[in-house]
Amino acid sequence: MKSPAPSRPQKMALIPACIFLCFAALSVQAEETSVTPQPPDILLGPLFNDVQNAKLFPDQKTFADAVPNSDPLMILADYRMQQNQSGFDLRHFVNVNFTLPKEGEKYVPPEGQSLREHIDGLWPVLTRSTENTEKWDSLLPLPKPYVVPGGRFREVYYWDSYFTMLGLAESGHWDKVADMVANFAHEIDTYGHIPNGNRSYYLSRSQPPFFALMVELLAQHEGDAALKQYLPQMQKEYAYWMDGVENLQAGQQEKRVVKLQDGTLLNRYWDDRDTPRPESWVEDIATAKSNPNRPATEIYRDLRSAAASGWDFSSRWMDNPQQLNTLRTTSIVPVDLNSLMFKMEKILSRASKAAGDNAMANQYETLANARQKGIEKYLWNDQQGWYADYDLKSHKVRNQLTAAALFPLYVNAAAKDRASKMATATKTHLLQPGGLNTTSVKSGQQWDAPNGWAPLQWVATEGLQNYGQKEVAMDISWHFLTNVQHTYDREKKLVEKYDVSTTGTGGGGGEYPLQDGFGWTNGVTLKMLDLICPKEQPCDNVPATRPLSESTTQPLKQKEAEPTP
């Protein structure tokens, strides 16, 4: 039976189909030319499960990062022989057969450092090099040095790195920016995508796609040469995110791609595996067991996909904000992801033009225009007056306001009148004395109230400024910087997240204790310091009073967190 003629939107989506077909081969080629390292839960099978379930270590990531001292198959064979013998000591067996990750030395900054001096001094402390790794190490080698976030995070993370790189550039470390771009390009060439982090157990997923923005950042220093140099890797990453689109029918989803009923193409977060995460093994098993009405594999996939989003975890993905087992990440089309995909398409167009391929540049521009229309049609809640995620189950835009709603402004994909409404919604519902709330829901999860995260502060600040909403943008920067400074004055460190209901308090919630370091906070703090202080009078600490050159506002009273989305 002949299919009905496609509607006009479907035709628009099909115009650049050759791009998807051509680049689908690129990601396949990358995967076929290298042997993908196996994660520790596969390498060690029942031994890995038993060690994690025995809770030998306070942090499940410890054993996931442990390095086998010999062939894992031999270790597993020895374990099977010994495990039922009387007096068998699992902890002793692990200590004999594995090299556990070393605790990093606690960094003690010199006395009397300003905030800027402290951050500048941290860059070498947070720099790692893994050109060579042990044969069975879960750590993936990278050709150049890189900057890690800090704390328990001993490896490089994808989306964290962009905000870290903003700070490196602000400090004049363009060599480190170039090294990190080269490392991510290496991962794309080796694995077909940029994994969540450079660990074997992160290979089944990616994270918010900032690589094109990293290349664009490098181009500020190196010019169009950077765009031309990394165009092939940007194309491969785009192919990874759009993998399977050529076979999709209207109303279907495949991996990271969603095709809506009118042919609009959007993206979602996805993990290729549906098992517990090795770095959070026991926690994931407990979450799955707590909801016997859902298949465990479905819950595992949604947990992993939430990790791919960077927002692990948040009421944003959950039907019941108080029950993690109700999350359904894969049935939600995220507004921030699709904003980043729009930006990727725009940068690919620019890079193609720089490389002299105007035809390809036009095709990417067509894709970006189609996606922008999709964002405006499906990811805007007209009743509420803000951008939000789209629900594939209810076939409606969701009602919850989150800090992700500022991403269309950040990438210049928003309509001007909607940007004005976003400024009002942000100031009314998300802005707090210590910065921008992630959501207005208190769930106990770390990507919810009262936590504020540096990358979201910067996205909001830049996004609002893009549309002339400077007052709210400066409010966010000033409030967050005050929070960072107060915490630094008391504890002499920058942390992963902050409690924005007040100032001077690190954030809480989630699966692990608060981490210090901290890469993306360092980067955003430097950018904001240079934003709020006049160029003729740069500041090394946050001023005691708000600079007169910027608009001043009354201090915000703390808003009560809402119990439900």
From Swiss-Prot:
Binding, substrate: 152, 159-160, 196, 205-207, 277-279, 310, 511
Entry-linked InterPro entries: 6-hairpin_glycosidase_sf, 6hp_glycosidase-like_sf, Glyco_hydro_37, Glyco_hydro_37_CS, Trehalase_periplasmic
GO cellular component, one term: periplasmic space
GO MF annotation: an example: alpha,alpha-trehalase activity
Pfam families, per the entry: Trehalase
Catalytic residues identified in the record: 312, 496
Tagged with keyword Transport: no
Annotated signal peptide: 1-30
Region (Disordered): 539-565
Gene Ontology process terms (BP): cellular hyperosmotic response; trehalose catabolic process
Enzyme Commission numbers on file: 3.2.1.28
Localisation per UniProt entry: Periplasm
Reactions catalysed, as given in the entry: alpha,alpha-trehalose + H2O = alpha-D-glucose + beta-D-glucose
Record keywords, A-Z: Glycosidase, Hydrolase, Periplasm, Signal
HAMAP family per record: Peripl_trehalase
Oligomeric and partner information: Monomer.
Family designation: Belongs to the glycosyl hydrolase 37 family.
Function recorded in the entry: Provides the cells with the ability to utilize trehalose at high osmolarity by splitting it into glucose molecules that can subsequently be taken up by the phosphotransferase-mediated uptake system.
Protein name per Swiss-Prot or TrEMBL: Periplasmic trehalase
Lineage: Bacteria, Pseudomonadati, Pseudomonadota, Gammaproteobacteria, Enterobacterales
